[in-house]
Amino acid sequence: MEASRRSAVKPVIVLKPSKRFPLVEDTPGKASDALPLPLYLTNAVFFTLFFTVVYFLLSRWREKIRASIPLHAVTFPEIVAIFAFVASLIYLLGFFGIDFVQSLIIRPSGDVWSGEDYEEENEVLLHEEDARTVPCGQALDCSVPSLPHMARNVTAQRLFDEKPVRVATEEDARKVSCGQAVDCSLHSLPPRPPIVTSQKLFHEKTVIVTTEEDEEIIKSVVAGTLPSYSLESKLGDCKRAAAIRREALQRLTGRSLSGLPLDGFDYESILGQCCEMPVGYVQIPVGIAGPLLLNGREYSVPMATTEGCLVASTNRGCKAIHLSGGATSILLKDGMTRAPVVRFSTAKRAAELKFYLEDPENFDTLAVVFNRSSRFGRLQSIKCAIAGKNLYLRFTCSTGDAMGMNMVSKGVQNVLDFLQTDFPDMDVIGISGNFCSDKKPAAVNWIEGRGKSVVCEAIIEGDVVRKVLKTSVESLVELNMLKNLTGSAMAGALGGFNAHASNIVTAIYIATGQDPAQNVESSHCITMMEAVNDGKDLHISVTMPSIEVGTVGGGTQLASQSACLNLLGVKGASKDVAGANSRMLATIVTGAVLAGELSLMSALAAGQLVKSHMKYNRSSKDMSNLSS
């Protein structure tokens, strides 16, 4: 019995409107309700306008009679005055005669609600929070006269629910009040109605229903007595905390978040690792480019982007590569870096530590200390740079299938603690001294590499260049030299010797749960093109020294991002070889960049860029209407 009473699904009762219990009050509308100005200002404006144009038209009429001018010969000011006269007259008649007009044309509101055609069109859902199941035939405190009051607390707007609902008719209500047997398979009416918070229902698409307890919490957050960041720990329900924080934010700012979805997301999955103080989530469309034939295997590449033409262009590049036999990618290096900065009292002491760290005899000892931090992290090298009495130590290590920033940081901290024994005068200024260098364009990443260093190449047949890419080998080679090489050099580019590598990198990063900010160094790329096979075919390659990706940790564990990794066959940690999945992901990113570079350069060479963007990347919506 107890188990049957504790239903996990909260049922919903729908009250059918009738003549006795209308869902909305019969309040007649007025013409002034359609205007945003206060009533007294609206009336003053139209009264003034009405008498002004009447005086003007009568004066003009008198002048025309005196000058023997036909009355139908009107000037532009007279036309404007006539329109103003008609508009003000309509308003004044509507304002003072609305009740009379409605009585002649429109049925009373009570008759409207009582019609059979409207009974199913105006259902009001009353959600129960703490209801209890009552056996059939028991006396219930749910008399019929209380129903209209409860119904008025909920907006009479049709609400949809995916769950099946039971319709409580007026006859059922009379049976309950008389103690007769009624089908009580659902819960009884709630002891207290929910509080409905609605703001400008004709402009908002959502109605937030909160309990009295949630309403008190919202008021506390708005008042500042309850910190917003503590809602998850205090409530124990991440989604409820997000909903309360969202409503409090709307009240504090006076701005609506109706376009930002709340439902359909697992907020437990981001607690303490991906995002703090969530109020919803942003939806980004994911397109598929491919198949990309890379190293003898086909990949369907997911790309999350809002830029039109990007997926289509990359897809065209994949087609050209596939028709030409595929592309080949080679991993050159795999090592994440972290560079702390330490300071000594003299430059001599800083140099002594530099010589100590770069001595091969000391590397094994330092590697043992470093490798204690993780079973995947393995120290590869230490590179030092001095600036006066400050020393920058750039540690490089393998990190398995993780991107590895946290892993290398823990290993570096172990080494710094170990060095304090022999260098007690060493002052650690920061665990990161920007010699790493993370999320910033830096020559050290371009030259030394960071993360995965990959090169990818393909030979595109001349027929494919002409038929698929709609250009020629000679045009592509010339454009690549003048744009990607000479043009980038003229601009003083650092790692930017490409057409749009960042576009593809960022789209794949967002889709697969990588850190989008690391596209700064991950997009370092040089694109090379040259004619081969007596000038008939095109050899194209991209070299990317700093691709920072992982298949475990961070955003990769989220459902959507995990699905995209699974599509590529690199989800989670590799069961065979540590780091194999993350290295495979890096090669796929490089192959997709190769396809994107090939297609965009072809569009530029053929003069198709502007035409394609006007067709696929131009909004057809009137932004002024959206903003209003």
From Swiss-Prot:
- Keywords assigned by UniProt, alphabetized: Endoplasmic reticulum, Glycoprotein, Isoprene biosynthesis, Membrane, Mitochondrion, NADP, Oxidoreductase, Plastid, Transmembrane, Transmembrane helix
The protein's recorded glycosylation sites are: 153, 371, 484, 617, 625
InterPro entries per UniProt: HMG_CoA_Rdtase, HMG_CoA_Rdtase_cat_sf, HMG_CoA_Rdtase_CS, HMG_CoA_Rdtase_eu_arc, HMG_CoA_Rdtase_N, HMG_CoA_Rdtase_NAD(P)-bd_sf, HMG_CoA_Rdtase_sub-bd_dom_sf
Q: Where mainly located?
A: endoplasmic reticulum
**What PROSITE patterns does the annotation carry?**
HMG_COA_REDUCTASE_1 (PS00066), HMG_COA_REDUCTASE_2 (PS00318), HMG_COA_REDUCTASE_3 (PS01192), HMG_COA_REDUCTASE_4 (PS50065)
Query: Per the UniProt record, which residue ranges are transmembrane?
Result: 38-58, 78-98
Instruction: Cite the CDD domains for this sequence.
Output: HMG-CoA_reductase_classI (cd00643)
Could you tell me what this protein is called? 3-hydroxy-3-methylglutaryl-coenzyme A reductase 2
Could you tell me which species this protein originates from?
Gossypium hirsutum (Upland cotton)
